[in-house]
Amino acid sequence: MASLLIALTLLAADAQTANILAVLPTPAYSHHAVYKAYVHALAKNCHNVTAVKPRLLDYALLNECGRIEQIDADMSLEQYQKLMAGSGAFRKRGVVADETTVTADNYMSLIEMFKDQFDNANVRHFLASNRTFDAVVVEASADYELVFGHLFRPATVIQIAPGYGLAENFDAAGAVARHPVHYPNIWRSSFSGEAAGALSEWRLLNEFELLASQRSNELLKQQFGLDTPTIRQLRDNVQLLLLNLHPVYDNNRPVPPSVQYLGGGLHLSQAPSHKLTAALERRLNESVDGAIYVSFGSSIDTNSIHAEFIQMLLESFVQLNNYTVLWKVDDTVPASVKLPSNVVTQKWFDQRAVLHHKKVVAFVMQAGLQSSDEALESRVPMVCLPMMGDQFHHARKLQQFGVARTLDTAVVSAAQLTLAIGEVIADAEAYRARIDDLRAVLEHDAAPAEKAVKFTERVIIFKHDMTRPARTLKTTSANIAYSDYFLRFPL
């Protein structure tokens, strides 16, 4: 009898185990800090995950009931570095890619990078194995990856974003996707003037329509065969969009249940803070008025920063000589300039450990979502120098909430930067009070990882198909062209 009960228990557990394919090719550390936490949460809930990804972050996890297999797209980091180097031609001061740089031509190289990754021998061998999966999870930032939902049909297709969603993601879900004032396109860098905003929204819509409907479709058919569906057809397969974000940052956008805001901070459960080295601990403790931490994230190639921008930073650091400045920067930069005596540079700092140190009084950063999560966790006021993508919008929201000062990175001077840093330090009590207020708003009803797993399991169990129309979380307007949405009505 006992043996029978054990067998039934094992069978029940096995029935609840899903085989999940996660296609996560973008070689950006901040993205994979989030994806790794999600994959680990799935494995801890006894799901088996096969991850197609670059090698920059190891997803290995031992002694869990679910297995993690990693398929290395090991050309991706090299290709990504080529992409970043090529983008230097249109980046202002070598770092700022504002909305004027967001064009189909500039972003085509990103799609070509994905194509090269999926041509990788490891990926080709995996595709030839004809394995089956219950779900395919892809990055929300690139429609090209949706082809895996077609290749492994009828698996449920899920998109995940390390932060904000794209307008195209919301269109596919049938959510409110576009408004020049209330729900601006996440690629926008300028938010003044309703007429200019509307024109920018229209241009961005057309640029990404060109990227998807023509160029991506052509590459998909070249790579996977003439019968490969179009991007618009592939979007129809998406049943769930997971956003590692609290909706307050997204202006509390109205969305259907197929769009789930996880609350943000998903990566924080994965990254326990380590102790600082003894030398760095001593340097911080000896700082006269405190320490300022400066980091522009993992996606900025500091070697491509223009010398004039480096000099602007150094002039500001000199004026802040009573503070120790910790500056995350590649080794080639300090080797080429004379550093002020109050500046300590390293290629990498344990950011959470630094921000948690009692002497750190300000954080100069690019307004990356994961970095701001860590600053809020540590109650450190921020000075934002946004450089690309969703950073402009996020920096704007942080300033609106009173937890940061935001400057125009393309034109900021040393005097302006010094003044902003001095302001957040001088008004530290007020900034920390507003940080505490924002943290209370961001408080989770459920842990982000728990919520992500719950909804992943739901769309797998209640698999949607045309014979079961009730089994969907999407709206009836999901993925409908605007011309049909506004102009075609059933009679």
UniProtKB/Swiss-Prot annotation:
Its EC number is 2.4.1.-. SUPFAM superfamilies: UDP-Glycosyltransferase/glycogen phosphorylase (SSF53756). CDD domains: GT1_Gtf-like (cd03784). Residues 1-17 form the signal peptide. Keywords: Glycosyltransferase, Signal, Transferase. The keyword Signal applies. One of its GO terms (molecular function) is UDP-glycosyltransferase activity. The keyword Zinc does not apply. It comes from the Viruses. Disulfide bonds: none annotated. InterPro entries: Ecdysteroid_UDP-Glc_Trfase, UDP-glycosyltransferase, UDP_glucos_trans, UDP_glycos_trans_CS. Belongs to the UDP-glycosyltransferase family. Catalyzes the transfer of glucose from UDP-glucose to ecdysteroids which are insect molting hormones. Expression of egt interferes with normal insect development and block molting. This is Ecdysteroid UDP-glucosyltransferase. It comes from Choristoneura fumiferana nuclear polyhedrosis virus (CfMNPV). The lineage of its organism: Viruses, Viruses incertae sedis, Naldaviricetes, Lefavirales, Baculoviridae.
